[in-house]
Amino acid sequence: MGVIRAVRSLDPFGSLLLGLAVLAFLFPFVESSGSARTFLLLPVAVALLAGWLAWERHVKKSKPFDPMVDMQIFRFPSFRLGTMLAGVYFMGITSIWVLVALYFQNGLGYSALVAGSVGIPAAISSSFAANWAGKRVADRGRRVVIDGITVALTGIVLTILALVLHHVTGLSEWWMVLTLFLVGTGQGAVIGPNQTLTLADVPLNYAGSSGAVLQTAQRIGTAMGLALITAIVFASSRAINWPLGTAIGFGTIGSLMAVALVIALYDNRLRAHRSAR
């Protein structure tokens, strides 16, 4: 009987609408043909999303079954801002290792094995940073995320400097291992703590749908960022050269990280204001 009740509580039409909206939104960014016509799906995605929101409000009001996502979760500032931060952050950070692989293979002529090994120190530092941040997020709150983004952003700026100096002065490309080490360290201190803080104020009965919304924002940000940033790098590299083209790509990532930092600072300010009341 419990299984039957669970099946009856599902929202198949809402699931279909949201699935089609996400598909229409992501397809132009992941379609390898690069046809501009695929971007005509974006208005369709907006229309489908609007239809889904209207349907979810109808389900909430008439209560034939549970809505997929109760829009009440968006009344929590920590959830709204944390989800925004995750989407913007993933739009930038996930493209870094793609750019590193492209630069070392296409720009410098190294093998895929060597290009992949560049990120090993960063991966190790990320695991230690994640452990460190996880133990402190309960006490320090959003400051952990702010510090992580700041460290990662510092690494990105130094990576841009290393790329420019490599082109201008012949500085060894292996300095990037050190700058990317900072990026990895910061990265490890952001993702887990942000998820914890984003969902901390959400009631348990909203936990499943809230986590799904957060993960969807991350996946959409990743798809958009990879398409946008790699397109910028390929266009810049053809027009200029690989070092400066890659530097422009890292500059784009840094801009997105700066936006994520502003969101984190704003959320931290709201939390401090609520605590002071």
Regions found by a protein language model. Give the residues of each.
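Hydrophobic transmembrane-helix bundles of small-molecule transporters
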Residues: 1-84
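12-transmembrane solute porter fold
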Residues: 38, 63-272
